[in-house]
């Protein structure tokens, strides 16, 4: 008997960054532990992290760049899903272009539609919606955007964290600042990491450790390497699996 499947529709790249994919990989690991066969549908965007999906052992279905229209994106995704529709238990969508119009068209073949969102700026046709961000009145942000039957997982208690964070020891109160952790996401498109390092450099303050985490495909990576040599105790990290140890 063939295993039941869970599909993820998510992208990564130089423009989108890596956060959408990384949080989906965390959720995918949980489905894998429950013996589901996990599939990812991804656009082949510039700077993508599809290789990371392969490393995790999940199945990948690449679709050509559909940046022209969401309609093309939907049609290509639907064609892939149709091949597995008798086995699909859940479709997880982490993509700001998708909305109620396209999600609803998959109702006939998908038992459970699971949306991961941050924006609360469009309606969804889904069974579960996850938004772990802490906003003012976060409990009410989606009241008019989903049906009353939808299970809402809202707020920081639902944040998707890698297992390494659950084994971290509770730390004592810090009396003096000795260690700085800098990360603005894998891509850091607006180059905030370098701005912070320049500020530290101008301040002439000294710290025991200054740890900067970025993705290797970050377009400012060489600049970061260069400035890190000018400031004492700065280390640049990328694509690491133990980020909690640096925090």
Roles of regions detected by a PLM:
Residues 169-247:
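Donor-nucleotide binding loops and adjacent catalytic segments primarily
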Residues 125-191, 213-222:
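A nucleotide-sugar donor-handling region in carbohydrate enzymes
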Residues 19-26, 192-196:
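Conserved alpha-helical elements of sugar-nucleotide-dependent glycosyltransferases
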Residues 5-21, 183-190:
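Short, glycine-rich nucleotide/cofactor-binding loops
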Residues 8-18, 25-30, 36, 42-57, ...:
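Active-site and donor-binding regions of nucleotide-sugar-utilizing enzymes
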Residues 1-5, 79-86, 202-209:
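Short, Lys/Arg-enriched, disordered terminal segments
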């Amino acid at each position: 008997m063939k295993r039941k499947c869970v599909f993820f529709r998510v992208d990564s790249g130089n423009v989108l960054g890596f956060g959408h994919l990384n949080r989906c990989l965390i959720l995918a690991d949980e489905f894998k532990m429950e013996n589901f066969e996990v599939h990812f549908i991804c656009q082949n965007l510039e700077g993508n992290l599809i290789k990371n999906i392969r490393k995790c052992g999940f199945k990948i279905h690449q679709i050509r760049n559909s940046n022209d229209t969401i309609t093309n994106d939907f049609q290509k995704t639907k064609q892939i899903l149709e091949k597995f529709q008798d086995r699909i238990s859940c479709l997880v969508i982490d993509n700001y272009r998708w909305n109620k119009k396209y999600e609803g068209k998959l109702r006939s073949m998908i038992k459970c539609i699971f949306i991961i969102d941050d924006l609360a700026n469009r309606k969804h046709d889904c069974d579960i919606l996850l938004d772990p961000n802490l906003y003012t009145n976060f409990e009410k942000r989606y009241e008019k955007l989903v049906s009353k039957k939808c299970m809402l997982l809202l707020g920081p208690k639902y944040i998707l964290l890698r297992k390494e964070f659950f084994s971290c020891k509770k730390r004592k109160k810090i009396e003096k600042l000795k260690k700085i952790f800098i990360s603005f996401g894998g891509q850091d498109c607006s180059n905030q990491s370098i701005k912070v390092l320049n500020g530290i450099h101008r301040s002439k303050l000294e710290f025991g450790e200054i740890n900067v985490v970025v993705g290797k495909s970050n377009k400012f990576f060489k600049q970061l390497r260069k400035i890190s040599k000018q400031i004492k105790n700065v280390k640049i990290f990328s694509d690491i699996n133990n980020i909690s140890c640096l925090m």
